[in-house]
Amino acid sequence: PSCIAYNNNQVYVGQGAKMLKSKLQPDQNIWFSFKMNLGKDNGPEFTRTELKEGNPLGKIENTLDATKLFFKKLKTEIDNYIQEQNLPRQLFYSVSIPASFEANQRADLKKALEFANIPINETLFIDEPNAAFLSYLVQANNNGFNNYNIPVDSPLHILVFDFGAGTCDISIIEIGKKAGKLYSKNIAISQFEQLGGDDIDRAIVKEILLPQLAKQNNISVEEIRENNYKKILLPKLQAVAEQLKIKVCKAVASNKVGQELPNLINSTERINFLQTIDFILPKQVMKFENPSISPKEFTDIMKKFTSETLAFNFQDDVESLKSIFTVINSALLKANIEKGDIDLVLLIGGSSYNPYIQTALYRHFDNSDIEIPQDLQSHVSNGTAINSFMANGLGVDIIKPIVSEPVFIILQNEVRKTVVYEGTEIPCKEILIEDLRPQRNDQKEIEIPICVSTKDKILTILKLKSEKGFSTTDKITLKCNISHDKLITFRAFIQNLEISTEPLNPFAN
């Protein structure tokens, strides 16, 4: 898991850090689901951090810091293992990331990897759903995928549903035959949305646990200050909500009949978290004894996350609430196919253990095969290792990656000019944007916003410079290259002479 902790003057990452979740304070000495905030330039985010500038172990003052330290610690552990096991020292890396990660997020991730001295190559990144599918392919003899026939004129469409703690990622993969050869490629990736199991936990806190806490302390919810809720109550209550969610899901799953949810989902019997929690607020101390939830209350919350008709799109810095079908529909729309065209739905990610999610997908994709592996959380890591072997060892790219969102420049009068269309296979040929002209004579700098998806998401601002000044007769050509890892570079020319370009810091998302 994307988790890093600081405890007893030691830094922990992954599962070791996650095990400390209930003992530590979020954004103070434990950080999780932080990768979703990469690509933002918010300055110092974690004002209460215990890892400040000057700490010999490193600093965590924002998301990029957390990511840098995460990979640095991971790299150290890998190097130690290689040395202990006396393995070859020449290493090649493959890193799995959310498929819907945009270029600015990938650029930040690359910075973190460079900080950790992890070597960068063209095939470093693989989208998590694609990695999961690679693992699934390798295990085809055990999971029945080898029973599929692939007609020449009718390729298979596989929808990989990757639902984790902080992400809901959809990748639609096409497998077909062309010129007697088998091919596989991405045809769509869902739009980036901040949706995951953590959002279910936050909904439990706000709708169930917060009213209980207020009642036990003889106050109203309205009397709880927003700042105290965000910084003190929510972090602790979210961990409790996660445990209650797991308890309800296990009870419901064990009583399922086929793929239908049991009558237990309407039960009002309380499921308890047997513990007393103290909250020290600036002006009072609050106690919370045995937080609880009923299956019916949890069912009401899950209806919102699995609604096919309601478009939940409420979002602020505390919570984001969307249905999983918001994400699914965005991928189907991009692929220009109907749900009935999907042959197989493959579930991946820890939050896919949720029986409400599974049942919702069975009902929605009623003409598709649904595959739920026993281990939902290992396929991504296994597939990433397979990708590293295939790409670094054999030079083979099994699934052709695509651009998930259009990239465009903004010209005079807010005119948009598309540079890269969504769905473009990458790496692609160099893209030329020709016949751009300065707006006035003697202009020494020209700024061109480069956007992804919408004009509100600025990837970077390209600054063109000329010491003698531009002329309105100058014909400017931009040359764009996009790598296998979806990282974009621009160069500018006037009459075949390259001119100085300088990217400004983006403020995306």
Positions of the model-derived regions?
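Short glycine-rich, Thr/Ser-proximal phosphate-binding strand/loop in the N-terminal lobe
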Residues: 1-5, 178-206, 498-509
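Conserved phosphate-binding/catalytic loops in two-lobed NTP-binding clefts
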Residues: 117-131, 358-385
